[in-house]
């Protein structure tokens, strides 16, 4: 028993010695701060809050500008006809315009593709597993998200319409660049790049396939463009009518 007591006593001495040599780190603020440090910390917190408010306001202005363009292009009108919840329509119209402009493609082509792929059903799943508005395959979505610098996470995240439009539009733009035309890209979007190369390599297969899915999307796109042009013409005539009245 005396041996244990001596050992404990020695341990206490050693711990005390080590503690003296290496002081315990006390959390910041526990010992109090110099007034100037505390004041600086408060200023930084205030500036951080102001920055967050400014960024939120900037995002609001950008969203408003994108939605105005969506109205002018006929995107908002097409989305309103989708049957989606009203609270989603504005955000989707903004997402389509923003992602299309980011990828340098016509926003109405994105709308046409969504109509043909999912009929604006956020939760559409094809027989082969393509998901969401633009029917993005999970593996393709993961690859595109990694390429864009973020993680897709669960494949069900493809049901998020903004994520789906972000990835689907980037994929369409990539295919247009790789295949050299919208029609060729649509073949690849529908059949996959590997099979698309084989389809496009043979005239008979190419003509037959082009008459299906690509023709359907292009027809929808042209219909949307015609509606857009009529709307632009009507807006151009309105000031003249107003002056005559």
Label for each model-derived stretch:
Residues 11-12, 127:
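Sterically constrained small-residue positions within well-ordered secondary structures
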Residues 37, 44, 48-51, 55-58, ...:
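Heptad-repeat positions
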Residues 58-245:
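Catalytic glycan-binding domains that act on GlcNAc-containing polysaccharides
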């Amino acid at each position: 028993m005396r041996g244990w007591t001596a050992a404990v006593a020695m341990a206490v001495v050693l711990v005390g010695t080590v503690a003296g040599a290496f002081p315990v780190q006390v959390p910041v603020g526990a010992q109090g701060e110099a007034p100037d440090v505390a004041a600086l910390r408060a200023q930084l917190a205030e500036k951080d809050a102001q920055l967050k408010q400014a960024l939120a306001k900037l995002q609001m202005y950008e969203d408003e500008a994108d939605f105005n363009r969506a109205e002018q292009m006929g995107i908002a009108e097409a989305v309103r006809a989708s049957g989606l919840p009203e609270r989603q329509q504005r955000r989707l119209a903004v997402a389509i315009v923003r992602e299309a402009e980011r990828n340098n493609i016509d926003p109405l082509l994105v709308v046409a593709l969504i109509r043909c792929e999912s009929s604006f059903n956020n939760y559409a799943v094809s027989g082969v597993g393509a998901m969401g508005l633009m029917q993005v395959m999970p593996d393709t979505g993961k690859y595109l998200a990694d390429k864009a610098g973020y993680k897709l996470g669960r494949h069900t995240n493809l049901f998020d319409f903004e994520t789906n439009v972000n990835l689907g539009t980037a994929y369409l733009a990539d295919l247009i660049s790789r295949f050299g035309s919208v029609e060729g890209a649509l073949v690849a979007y529908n059949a996959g790049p590997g099979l698309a190369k084989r389809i496009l390599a043979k005239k008979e297969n190419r003509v037959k396939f082009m008459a299906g899915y690509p023709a359907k999307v292009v027809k929808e796109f042209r219909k949307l463009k015609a509606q857009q042009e009529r709307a632009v013409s009507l807006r151009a005539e309105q000031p003249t009518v107003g002056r005559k009245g």
